[in-house]
Swiss-Prot record:
It comes from the Bacteria. GO terms for cellular component: cytoplasm. It catalyses: cytidine(2498) in 23S rRNA + S-adenosyl-L-methionine = 2'-O-methylcytidine(2498) in 23S rRNA + S-adenosyl-L-homocysteine + H(+). Gene3D superfamilies: 3.30.2300.20, 3.30.70.2810, Vaccinia Virus protein VP39 (3.40.50.150). GO terms for biological process: methylation; rRNA processing. It is found in: Cytoplasm. GO terms for molecular function: S-adenosylmethionine-dependent methyltransferase activity. It is an enzyme of class 2 (transferase). Belongs to the class I-like SAM-binding methyltransferase superfamily. RNA methyltransferase RlmE family. RlmM subfamily. This is Ribosomal RNA large subunit methyltransferase M.
Length: 365
């Protein structure tokens, strides 16, 4: 298997192709990306047979911005017999069983791309999963427990009922979610659907233990461009006191909590109140990404906060280039100022033409 399949939001295939090509080249691995617009995935074909497996192990998945999932895959299986789709799939796994330990594989996911056309296969995928799982277990595979981090997850990427890619991902270096998509329910008392963006960001960037330590009732936050309160809602729910900065009105339900102070000011001019030590800054303002990046830097460099989650709205063209430029500017500025920091960026499921960035400033040298 010399290919990687990487899932993404339809329309962002070119950005993902550029990103995976760059990350592979940094490891001295070369190949080419097969890209079809709006198909919801990219196939990166390596020139050397074992290189796809190496990429799946050595490129930290959490450093990929546009990828929802990363799996090593076979050549495309076509013309699967309607009466026996399982045997060709088993044969693909048998061909790699001497190299990859499939015994302690933990889970089987029969998936599609995140497109309307592909989703029409979802009922088929559910039905097909049961007999395929049984057949894999008969081979002595899928014997691991689900949370076995050193194990593998087996993936079947169905293009239609007769075509699929057969593959696997490493449990320590993949998305644990089906199709790479977290299933979040919209809270009925939240002021806007944007609340799901911050919830997904917190779940993506922080472990459960980190969330409890770093987002709690002893902390203060500032939400720039807060109206009507979708992001503020997530912070208040976790017990933080929030300075909600926006000329627009905040939802009455948030005022009723007693955990917010509405500051009717411009988010670019607002400065934190001296009486409070601000732990978190969040920002979902619609503005040029370079301007938002400069704003976030101002807060971090001035010591006004030590952790932040913010969105960068992307231009119509050269989106990956713009992302790289903004993140590089932030990193270089923090390093120049002597900061130690941790930065992550992700094109979340609930993001559209934007990415979400998390930065934690650890300390000053």
């Amino acid at each position: 298997m010399n290919k990687l399949a990487l899932y993404c939001r339809p329309g962002f295939e070119k950005e993902l192709a550029a990103e995976i090509s760059e990350k592979a080249a940094e490891l001295g691995i070369f190949g080419f990306a097969r890209v079809e617009e709006n198909q919801g995935y990219v196939i990166f074909e390596c020139y050397q047979t074992d290189d796809a497996d190496r990429l799946a192990r050595e490129i930290p998945f959490n450093q990929l911005i546009f990828a929802r999932q990363m799996i090593v895959v076979s050549d495309l299986l076509t013309d699967l017999p309607v009466q026996d789709r399982i045997s060709p799939i088993i044969q693909q796994y048998q061909a790699i069983a001497h190299q990859i330990n499939l015994t302690y594989s933990t889970e089987l996911l029969v998936e599609t791309a995140d497109t309307n056309e592909a989703k029409s296969l979802s009922a088929f995928c559910r039905k097909f999963t049961v007999p395929l799982r049984q057949a894999l277990k008969k081979q002595g595979w899928l014997q691991g427990t689900r949370h076995h981090k050193q194990g593998l997850t087996l993936h079947i990427l169905m293009l239609d009922s007769t075509q699929c890619y057969v593959g696997y991902s490493y449990n320590y270096n993949h998305s644990e979610h089906f199709m790479g998509i977290p299933r979040l329910k919209f809270p009925l008392d939240a002021p806007s659907r944007s609340t799901l963006k911050l919830e997904e960001a917190i779940l993506t960037f922080l472990s459960r233990e980190e969330e409890k330590k770093r987002l709690n009732e002893q902390m203060y936050a500032v939400d720039l461009g807060a109206c009507p309160g979708g992001w503020t809602y997530q912070l208040v729910k976790r017990g933080l006191f929030v300075y909600a900065v926006d000329h627009g009105k905040m939802a009455a339900s948030l005022h009723d909590t007693g955990r917010i102070e509405h500051c009717a000011e411009d988010g670019f001019k607002f400065q934190p109140p001296k009486r409070s030590k601000i732990d978190w800054l969040v920002c979902d303002m619609v503005e040029q990404p370079s301007r938002i990046s400069q704003l976030i830097l101002k807060w971090l460099v001035n010591g006004w906060c030590h952790e932040t989650i913010f969105n960068l709205k992307l231009p119509m063209k050269k989106r990956y280039l713009e992302v790289k430029k903004c993140l590089q500017m932030i990193e270089e500025s923090l390093e120049k100022q002597g900061f130690r920091y941790h930065i992550q960026a992700k094109h979340l499921y609930h993001d559209r033409e934007e990415i979400t960035v998390h930065i934690a400033v650890k300390s000053l040298d």
